[in-house]
Every structure is written in C-alpha cells, then in structure tokens.
C-alpha cells in the first residue's frame, strides 16, 4: 500500500521498502505507481468508485502465486473495492508462442491448478500463455470480462518497440507501466 507515510520517507528508505515488491496499491491522488517489466506481464487496475489503483508485475512466479487475485483482495480490504466494478489493463508482455518454459515451470502451473489444456501448448518444449493466465485470474476474482483490456502485444516479437529480456538479454531496458489518480 502506497500511503502518504511512505511518500514522506527518505528516498533511500523508500527504495529499500519497495525492493522486490511486485504489486502496489494506492488511493493517494497525484502519486504515480508502476512496475517495470521486460517480458513479464504488467497489469493496471482501477477502481473508479473508491478512486484507487493497482500496478502489478506478473512474472511466471507471481502468476503461479496468483498475484492478480491477491492484489484485488488487498484492494478490497484497503479500499472496499468491488471486483465487478474494476477496470483492468493487461500490458505488453511475452506471448504463448514465445514463452518457452522447462518442465519445472509447467509443473508449477499444473500444481497451482491452472487449466493446462487452455494455457499451455507443447511444441519442442512447453509454452505458457502468461497473459491469458492473468486474465483468467482477474475473471476468477470477479472482474468482468468486458472490463479487461489486453494489449496483445508480445514484447519478444516487438523488441524494437518494447524491451524483451529473453530476446535482448537480461540487461535490456525495462518498460515502466504506471498509473496516477488525478
């Protein structure tokens, strides 16, 4: 939760507090929250009724741990958010075609009860549809399908426009996806 107390901390302290955080929620006007990605899936949530937002970094590990659903639960607790009234944007990230994974990642999704016949595809190796996994999570949490906008932009395929750690290397740049309440 990004509250005014966090904003009053020295920058170095704020950096330590936020290190490794994959989701932020706030209802503080004028504060931009966001996540940096380079193939992982950025998700923005907006609750117009309670003027609250969330920014989520959904890598495969966070997706397996259901970070989108957990963030919605946090918004519900902190702000009284009704998931049915949320608006969601699933930003640019790696696509099913390009997200090749090992058996251990496939098994992690299977063990987390994801519908493997819908989200996975066997080519030479397994491929996982990370954007779809997160869209399913949003819907399972109560977000209406018509309130979810997926950009359907693959960072791996469009690495000239968007950063891709898989294609350009781990030291590639990062995409910052942010949201501010005015």
Segments the model singles out, each with a brief description of its role:
Residues 1-182:
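Active-site microenvironment for binding and transforming phosphate-containing groups
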């Amino acid at each position: 939760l990004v509250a005014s107390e966090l904003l009053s901390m020295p920058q170095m302290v704020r950096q330590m507090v936020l290190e490794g955080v994959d989701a932020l929620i706030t209802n503080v006007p004028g504060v931009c929250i966001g996540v940096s990605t380079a193939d992982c899936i950025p998700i923005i949530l907006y609750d117009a009724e309670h003027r609250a937002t969330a920014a989520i970094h959904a890598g495969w590990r966070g997706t397996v741990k259901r970070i989108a659903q957990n963030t919605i639960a946090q918004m519900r607790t902190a702000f009284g958010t009704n998931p049915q009234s949320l608006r969601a944007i699933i930003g640019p990230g790696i696509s099913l075609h390009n997200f090749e994974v090992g058996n251990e990642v496939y098994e992690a999704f299977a063990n987390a009860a994801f519908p493997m016949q819908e989200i996975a595809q066997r080519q030479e190796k397994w491929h996982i549809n990370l954007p779809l996994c997160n869209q399913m999570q949003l819907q399972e949490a109560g977000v209406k399908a018509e309130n979810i906008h997926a950009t359907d932009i693959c960072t791996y395929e469009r690495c000239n426009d968007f950063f891709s750690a898989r294609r350009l290397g781990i030291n590639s740049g990062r995409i910052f996806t942010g949201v501010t309440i005015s």
